[in-house]
Amino acid sequence: AEVEYGAQLIQDFTYFNRSFMLGSALIQLYNTGTDYQTTGVFDANCFSLGVKVTVGTHSAFLAGDINNFTGVEDELASQVGSVDFLKMGHHGCPGSNTAAYLDALSPLYVFQTGKYSMLPTQTAQSLANMGSRYASTDDVCADGLDAYVVTLSATGVTSNFDYSKPRVYYSEEAGAYRCYQGGLPNASFTGWIRGDGGWLWFDCSS
């Protein structure tokens, strides 16, 4: 791009060059520090970039592989602000998406690029308490969608995902299946529902 189109290649970020417009969207880059080059970190995920996309008054935060092992989420909690949509950090694995961080961002929608089974119970509970509507890559594949698409506009946030369907997830930490509907745990669901391990019966339980 630099050679063919004359695009400027920026590798050193400052407060002044980490934000730019892309069409009608404001793009803001987070976790751009370079301390890891001198102090070292145990994993490259610790310096994963986060990207906030804002259109009008609506926004999304794409958290890449960000985690909180070095306190990155603690810092972002006071920097990013509330968002409409959150792509969860580090595939939803333990050590990421901490309760205080999620509470600060308070997303209406969350998407996990990983399996629900690896999602810590505390994370799932934090999302449920906030009313954040959940979906994952497994759901997208099961529905035969090419991709999960979230659209930000001046009028609001929409998605191509069908949240109305009841869905069942298995939590390794809890050792139990959970039923979701509308992107949230549904404690009143009663009936048969098919999961990875076969058909399951729920009787007013999630």
Locate the predicted segments by residue.
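Binuclear metal-dependent hydrolase catalytic cores
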Residues: 1-26, 117-133
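Core dinuclear metal-dependent hydrolase active-site scaffold
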Residues: 12-82, 147-165
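A short, compositionally biased
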Residues: 14-16, 143-146, 173-174, 205
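A mature extracytoplasmic/lumenal domain signature
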Residues: 31-33, 64-66, 116, 184, ...
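Short, polar loop/linker segments at the starts of domains and inter-domain junctions
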Residues: 38-44, 99-102, 188-190
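Short hydrophobic beta-strand that contains or immediately precedes a catalytic carboxylate
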Residues: 61-63, 87, 202
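Cap/insert and terminal regions of metallo-dependent hydrolase folds
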Residues: 71-146
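Extracellular adhesion/carbohydrate-binding repeat motifs centered on closely spaced tryptophans
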Residues: 165-206
